[in-house]
């Protein structure tokens, strides 16, 4: 989307001899600095990944471009970054580009951490995309974006220790068990990204009452408080809330 009135700069990249340009908009939201990559042909569509039935045929190009443009912008800003964090196959090419295309730059020493939210979504595509996107073109196999990140990211994580262990074996690994096993020492599970030293019902200051596995009485008091706050009818039935 075009963000009128925001600061922006032009970013140009090369993908296997093809030149691409985009605008990167910079803004702050609740004190957090945000950079948004704008490219009308790639991203101004009704849906982000598919037409409702099938993935867009140019998805490999769209998201390889996004990854390399984001890295090029990061290089141009001359800021010091602690980590580059990618999520799922859409950012997987970034791990390869960082190690291979940005070697020798100020970004080269920045570690790339890759989070797998659903290992079934891998974006497997024909071998010719390796040449077109300049992703290990010497390899004569299909291009698997997720597998590329498993190979080149410095550290891997996923949504829980249980899911991490499941991905070590088929069929949950969806064909990539060997890669997960090879990176086992660098692969951790972080339960929903939640820090239980802070978000714990036994000590959370935002709750009306505290509770834990050994003393659950406070849970009923919390339910009573939210029912009153939302002006709901008080019943003995469970309270379900969806976000």
Describe the role of every protein-language-model region.
Residues 1-243:
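Catalytic cores of nucleotide-sugar-dependent glycosyltransferases that transfer UDP/GDP/TDP-activated
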């Amino acid at each position: 989307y075009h963000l009128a009135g925001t600061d922006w700069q032009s970013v140009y990249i090369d993908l296997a001899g093809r030149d691409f340009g985009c605008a990167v908009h910079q803004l702050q939201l609740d004190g957090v600095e945000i950079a948004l990559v704008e490219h009308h042909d790639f991203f101004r569509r009704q849906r982000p990944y598919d037409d409702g039935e099938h993935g867009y045929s140019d998805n490999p190009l769209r998201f390889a471009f996004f990854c390399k443009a984001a890295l090029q912008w990061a290089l141009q800003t001359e800021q010091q970054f602690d980590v580059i964090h990618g999520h799922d196959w859409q950012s997987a090419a970034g791990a390869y580009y960082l190690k291979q295309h940005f070697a020798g730059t100020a970004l080269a020493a920045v570690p790339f951490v890759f989070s797998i939210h659903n290992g079934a979504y891998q974006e497997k595509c024909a071998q010719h995309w390796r040449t077109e996107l300049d992703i290990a073109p010497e390899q004569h196999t299909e291009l698997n974006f997720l597998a590329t990140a498993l190979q080149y990211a410095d550290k891997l994580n996923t949504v829980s220790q249980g899911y991490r262990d499941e991905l070590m074996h088929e069929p949950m690994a969806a064909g990539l068990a060997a890669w997960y096993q090879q990176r086992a020492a660098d692969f951790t599970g972080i339960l929903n990204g939640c820090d239980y030293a802070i978000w714990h019902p036994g000590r959370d200051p935002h709750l009306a009452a505290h509770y834990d596995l050994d003393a659950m009485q406070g849970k009923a008091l919390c339910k009573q408080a939210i029912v009153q706050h939302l002006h709901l009818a008080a019943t003995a039935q469970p309270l379900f809330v969806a976000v």
